[in-house]
Amino acid sequence: MSAVSRRNVLRGGLVATTAGVVAPGTVAEAVAAADGASCPAPPGPAMVGHGDRRYRSLASRGYNRRVVGEPEHVWVVGTTAHVVRAAQQAVDSGGRITVRSGGHGFENFVADPAVEVVVDMSAMTGVSYDPARRAFAVEAGALLGDVYRRLYLGWGVTIPAGWCADVGVGGHILGGGYGPLSRLMGLSVDHLYAVEVVVVDRRGRARAVVATREPSDPHRDLWWAHTGGGPGTFGIVTRYWFRTPADGDDPSGLLPAPPAGVLSFQVSWDWEKLDRTSFARLVRNHGAWAEQHSAPDSPYLALYSELALTRRPSGTVFMIGQVAADSGAERMLDEHIAALNRGVPVQPVRPVRNQAWLAAALAGSPGDPGPVYRLKVKSGYLRRRFTDRQIEALHHHLTRTDYDHPGGGVSLYTHGGKVNTVAPDATATPHREASIKMF
C-alpha cells in the first residue's frame, strides 16, 4: 500500500505508473463520437487565460479560501476527447497540470503556485445507465447531489458517498468515498466497476484508458489504484462506472437502494456545563460505543454520527447524524445518546427531524456554511478509542485561554460496519479495521 501516494501531484504532465496503460489503442475518439452522435454539443474545449472574463471564476472556484491559485490557464472541457487534448497540450509545453472537479479539496494540490494548467471538469456532469457494462456511468464533474437525485429518481438506487451535496464526484471517489450510508453499504469504491482515465504513456502521448475490476482486464491495476489512491495521482478521471457485484440486467438491482426515509438529528452539550471530568467521560463513552458497534454484524449499522469536539468559545459540543428510518430509528437514537451520556451530568439538547432520504441527502450536513471556509485540516483513522492521556490533551487545547478564537476542533465519525468486510488489499483504501474516522 505504501506505493500509493495521496499527495503525489503530477509534475510536468501525467505519467501513468501502471504497465498496462501503454497498450496500443485508444477510446477517446469512440467516446467523442458517441457524445456527438447522441447529445447536443458539449461546452468546450476552451483554454481560459488571465485576459478572459471567466478566468477569476474558474481559478477561484475552490472550497477552501485559504488557498487560491493563479494558473496560466484553465481548460473548460466537456468530453473525454477535450481532456486528452488539454493533457497533451500540457505535456508538449512542459507545464505542470492538475484537475478540479467540485473544488472541495482542502489542501493546495490544485491552488498550488507551481500549477500552470488546471483542467476544470465542472461541465462533465452526465449520469446514465450503461447496458453494455450493466453499470451506471457517472462523469467526474458531477456533484454528489446530482448523482443522488438522478440515480434515485431514475432507478431507486444510490452509491454510499459523502454528506455534502456540492462535493464533486471526481476527487471524492478517489479518496474512497465515505458517508452516512457507508456503515450499511460500504465505501463508494466498493461499488466501483470501472474508471475511464486520461493518462500519458512513456512516449508522451495522452490518451484515454478504461480499466475495470474484471480479473482478466490487463488494466485492472489501474482500476485498483483508483479505489482510494488519491485524486490526480495516476491521471485525469473522466468517468466512473458503478455496479455492486450482482447478476441480472435490471438496473434497480445493480446498486443498493437507500432507505425511504431517515431520522436526522443534532444533539448538543453546553460547554459551560462540561467540566474536565464530564468532557472526558463523554469522549470515552463515544469511543467505547464506536468500538463496540464497528463490526459488520452490529445492530446499529443504520446509525451514523459525527461528534464535533469544538473549542469552548463556540458554546457547545455537538453531534449530528442520521438513522435509517425503517430500522427502529427513534429507539436506536435514544440508546445511542444514553450510551454517550452515561455518567455525564449534562442533559443534551436533541432536535430531530424525519425526512425523506433524498431530501436529507440533498440538504447535506446541518449547519454547513458552504464554500466560505479558510482552514487547515488533518484526518486519520482510529481502531480504538482515545487514551485518557489523549483525551486530556484534547480538553487542554479546546479550553486553553491563550487563544480565544472559536474556530478549530476535532470531529469523530462513526466508522466500520460494511466498510470493514472488505480485505485491506482488495482496494487502495486500506483502512478496513477502523471504528472512528477523525477529522
Residue ranges and their predicted role:
Residues 1-17:
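N-terminal secretory signal peptides and thylakoid transit peptides that target proteins
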Residues 52, 63-124:
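Glycine-rich N-terminal segment of FAD-binding domains in flavoprotein oxidoreductases
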Residues 161, 166-270:
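FAD-binding subdomain of flavoenzyme oxidoreductases
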Residues 36-63, 102, 107-110, 252-439:
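Cofactor-binding catalytic cores of oxidoreductases
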Residues 134-138, 142-152, 168-169, 353-357:
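Short, structural beta-strand-to-alpha-helix junction motif
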Residues 65, 110-139, 180, 184-185, ...:
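Glycine-/small-residue-rich beta-strand-loop submotif within the FAD-binding core of flavoenzymes
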Residues 19-37:
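C-terminal region of N-terminal signal peptides and the immediate post-cleavage residues
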Residues 92-96, 114-115, 154-158, 233, ...:
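Loop/turn elements at helix/coil->beta-strand transitions in domains of secreted/extracellular proteins
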